[in-house]
Amino acid sequence: MRSFFKQYLFKLFNALSFLIPIKLQLELDSDIDVVILIQKPLGIGDLVMLSPLVILLEEKFIKNNIYIVTEYEKFIDFNRASWIHPSSPKKCSLANSIVISPMLVFTHLEYIFQSKYFIGYFFSNKLTSNFMKSEYKYSLTSGHYFRKIFTILDALDIEYDKENLSYPRIMTTDFTRNSDNVVIAPYVNWEERQFPLSKFVSLIHSLLEICSCKIVLIGSDNPLEVEFNKQLEALVSSSRLDNQTGYTTLLKMSDLISKAKLYIGNDSGPSHIAYLNARRSIVFFGSVRFE
C-alpha cells in the first residue's frame, strides 16, 4: 500500500511539473510515439479543423509513430497517422510517448499520468506541459482552433504557414453513384446555430418545385437529430425526400456529400466535410434569414 502511494505521488509530481519554471530538453527518438487526443464531446467538425495539426506533426516526426485517439471511425486519409479507440487496447506505449491535447476535454486529463511528455489543454484554457513553460491562455468564447494549435506548434519548434495550411483527403465509399441528389444536413447541436425547421420546409419545397432532383436528409443516430429530421420529413411529405438520418456511417455520409450536385447544412460536422469534398455547398452560419 505504501509503495503504491509513493508511486502515485511520483506520477502526480511528474504530471504537475509544468508548475516548475524549467524547460526540459524534448528529444524525440524514433521509439517515442506521438499521441493526439481528439475524444468526444469533440465532433467530426473538430477533427477536420484540427487535421492540419496532424499533417504538420507527421511531417515533423517522420520517424515516429503517430496515433489519433478518438471514438470516431476513420474518415480522414492521413499519410501515416493511425486511429485508436479510447476503449480498445492501446497500440502505442503511453509510457514512452508525447501526448498532445489540442482542445480542452476533461477525459484527456488521465493521459498525463501515463505519458512521458504531455502538452496541450487538459483541465483549463491554459496551455500546460511537463517540458516547457507557457503563459498562453485561449479565450473560451472567441479562441479559434488555429490560435490554439499554433501555440503547440511553436512549442514543438514546428514551422508552418498560417495562410497555406494543408488539409487531408476525406475518405468515401461506393455507397451511391447518383450525382443528381441534393444532400441536406438540417440539424446542429447548438440552438444558436440551428436554421429553423419551418425554413428548411420552405427551402425543400422550393427545391422540389424548381428541379427534378431527389432530396437526401443525412445525420447521426443522435435521438434529437433523428426526431428533428423525422419532423422535417413529415412536414415536407414528398416521395422525392429520402431520410437517411441515423442509417449512414461517416464514410457513407461523406460519399453522399461528395457525389451530390449540392450540399446544404448548418455550421456542423457534415458541413466541415462538405468544405473539403462537396462539389457545391451552402452553409447557414448562425441566424440567417432564408428570404
Outline where the language-model segments fall.
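Catalytic machinery of carbohydrate-active enzymes
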Residues: 1-291
